């Protein structure tokens, strides 16, 4: 009987720990993206997905000097809520806008049919720069965002 009581007391705590590990893995930058593979893409915005849990910007990399795969890319940004708090809304990136995106390529490096990356910054032709929101646990910090805690 005592072992059943102990199990009843320990099981909920264990379930919470396991749930936290799964949630952390989902939101881990290092699970999907490679901090040793920085990218720079130059292209025109084709589509913006303003959805949870992450926004996505679709563009074609057309930079002739780029060492990255030319063609379609999906670039992950922060959550819509994170971006809204930074003053970015669904109308900040209009279809057809020319942008430069810096970020990090996916670990799988698969580009069929579309390459994937985690975006860090978007730069507009007039020089304005937008931070694309939190890159998640394990993402490199370059100090360009004042709200980021220092890397430990």
Label every PLM stretch briefly.
Residues 8-20:
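Bacterial N-terminal signal peptides
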Residues 23-30:
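Boundary at the C-terminal end of the N-terminal hydrophobic targeting segment
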Residues 1-5:
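N-terminal secretory signal peptides that target proteins for export/translocation
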């Amino acid at each position: 009987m005592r072992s059943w009581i102990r199990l009843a007391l320990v099981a909920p705590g264990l379930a919470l720990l396991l749930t936290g590990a799964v949630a952390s893995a989902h939101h881990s930058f290092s699970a999907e993206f490679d901090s040793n593979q920085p990218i720079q893409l130059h292209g025109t915005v084709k589509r913006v997905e303003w959805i949870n849990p992450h926004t996505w910007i679709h563009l074609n990399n057309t930079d002739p000097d780029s060492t990255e795969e030319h063609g379609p890319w999906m670039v992950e940004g922060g959550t819509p809520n994170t971006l809204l708090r930074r003053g970015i809304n669904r109308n900040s990136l209009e279809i057809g806008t020319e942008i430069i995106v810096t970020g990090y390529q996916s670990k799988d490096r698969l580009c069929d049919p579309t390459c994937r990356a985690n975006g860090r910054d978007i730069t507009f032709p007039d020089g304005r720069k937008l931070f694309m929101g939190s890159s998640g646990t394990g993402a490199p910090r370059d100090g360009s965002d004042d709200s980021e805690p220092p890397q430990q």
